[in-house]
Design a protein with these regions (language model features):
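PLP-dependent amino-acid enzyme catalytic core
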Residues: 1-472
Length: 472
């Protein structure tokens, strides 16, 4: 069995299935594997040209540690990626001799979150059914995670899903993907606050152990290790398509909660030859500032055209602190306590140096983001969403070394942000025909104050696990 440990060192070690159902560790930390599995260069090279779901099985298998049979994992991966509307699942497009764009938006809700969510919903339902358990999933979303979770978990017998999103701070398409499902096990809550407020509510509920146990609480934000593992796969498939492992590659990743780019770090730890992981931030640039100064300091969140990155508390950064700090859990606890008390912490010199060896960072403001949307349309005839545009703007600043392929992650379909795209380049992206009815369906949502007690009471009222007393 693969063992998982908490970044804060005070929670029990767990196996893969328990980590997936647990989400946040009971000490407030995040789970990571005690030892990183390795893939040989021959194994990685062998991924070339294989179906995406087969590569997913080979990448995920060592993390599952024998807890899920290969045949079951293969069946669920095949089903999950059959929901995507491109034969390659996540196609890699060449934009210039050395720059590629990895399209992660061909899933049911047009965002990269579908890649992990379509698989994790099947994995969770499979494990719950085998154990005869139900769970209550509470998820915070800055826009895309919620829609992907609703699509993936709607109608499942063993799961109740409650989605928290910042009221008035996401696009209409994003909101409607959460509010129009009609499934009895799905509940959308518009919280009067920011995404960071929503995420803080979810963490507070996990840290209320009596409530957590009563509802059999679980989470599918990227605090959940299974989400990260599922995203590792496309780093391998895209890098191999661009020439790895015979040559190294760079990745440029639109970054908010640090989950997607951390999956790239995991791929590198497993043996993928990645030269640089570049964080692309909008004006909410806490991670870019941290890499520059060594000080992680929360500032006011500014609403932008790339709302999924309008974040100041990047949860998955804690996983990197733990790894870069050589598994110093006490050190992580000190940093997180400082963040909680003062809204800032100073990175130890050795930790900062270790992070800078693997990552660099850039930011793009609203003007630069709009210019990148215009440039993609003018030069390549491509409409790109604002998050992808941030990454393109950051990538295009460093074009001195053209020997290493640069892969920009395109995380959402432009039609999820039609107003921003049209304002930038004059072209309005259209939703795919199969989503025609989305904008006219009736919505079901509840506006709620940023109040932990009020949210917990609502969750208790809809949780079948709580009502049946089956929390385990």
């Amino acid at each position: 069995m693969t063992r998982y440990i908490s970044t804060r060192g005070e929670a029990p070690e767990l196996g893969f299935c328990d980590v997936m159902l647990t989400g946040l560790a009971r000490d407030g930390g995040l789970y990571v594997p005690a030892i990183w599995p390795q893939l040989s260069a021959d194994t990685i090279a062998g991924f070339f040209g294989r179906p995406y779901w087969e590569v997913a099985v080979d990448v995920i298998r060592p993390f599952a540690g024998g807890e899920i049979a290969d045949a079951e994992l293969g069946r669920m991966a095949n089903e999950a990626y059959a929901t995507f509307r491109h034969p390659a699942v996540v196609p890699l497009r060449q934009m210039s001799p050395h720059q590629f764009v990895l399209e992660l938006f061909h899933g049911p809700t047009l965002a990269f979150k579908d890649v992990a969510m379509q698989l994790i919903s099947r994995l969770m339902d499979h494990v719950l059914a085998k154990r005869g358990q139900r769970t209550t999933i509470v998820v915070a979303t800055s826009g895309d995670t919620g829609g992907a979770a609703v699509e993936a978990f709607a109608g499942l017998e063993n799961v109740d899903l409650i989605v928290l999103f910042p009221h008035g701070r996401i696009s209409e398409v994003q909101r409607r993907m959460m509010t129009t499902t009609g499934a009895a096990n799905v509940h959308a809550l518009a919280i009067e606050g920011t995404f960071d407020d929503c995420q803080a509510l979810v963490k507070a509920m996990f840290n209320n152990h009596r409530f957590r146990d009563a509802t059999s609480l679980s989470g599918v934000n990227s605090i959940n290790w299974a989400r990260i593992v599922a995203q590792v796969v496309y780093y391998f498939t895209s890098a191999v398509a661009a020439g790895a492992p015979a040559r190294a590659v760079d990745f440029v990743v639109p970054t908010g909660n640090f989950g997607d780019i951390f999956a790239g770090y995991v791929a590198k730890r497993m043996g993928l030859p990645v030269r640089t992981l570049r964080i692309a931030a909008n004006v909410n640039d806490i991670l870019a500032r941290t890499l520059k100064t060594g000080i992680y300091e929360v500032r006011e969140v500014h609403a932008t055209a790339s709302p999924s990155m309008d974040i100041q508390i990047s949860s998955n950064f804690e996983r990197l602190l733990f790894e870069a700090g050589r598994h110093d859990a006490a050190g992580v606890r000190r940093l997180m306590e400082s963040l909680k008390q003062s809204g800032r912490f100073v990175l130890p010199d050795a930790t900062l140096a270790a992070i800078r060896e693997e990552f660099d960072a850039g930011r793009a403001d609203e003007t630069e983001t709009a210019a990148a949307i215009r440039a993609a349309w003018r030069e390549a005839g491509e409409l790109v969403d604002p998050h992808t545009a941030v990454a393109l703007a950051v990538a295009d600043r460093d074009t001195t070394d053209t020997t290493v392929p640069s892969i920009v992650l395109s995380t959402a379909h432009p039609a999820k942000f039609p107003d921003a795209v049209e304002a930038a380049c004059g072209q309005r992206p259209q939703l795919p025909a199969w989503l025609d009815g989305l904008m006219t369906k009736s919505e079901h949502m509840k506006v709620m104050k940023n109040d932990q007690g009020e949210v917990e009471r609502f969750v208790l009222s809809v949780s079948r696990a709580a009502k049946q007393g089956v929390a385990g």
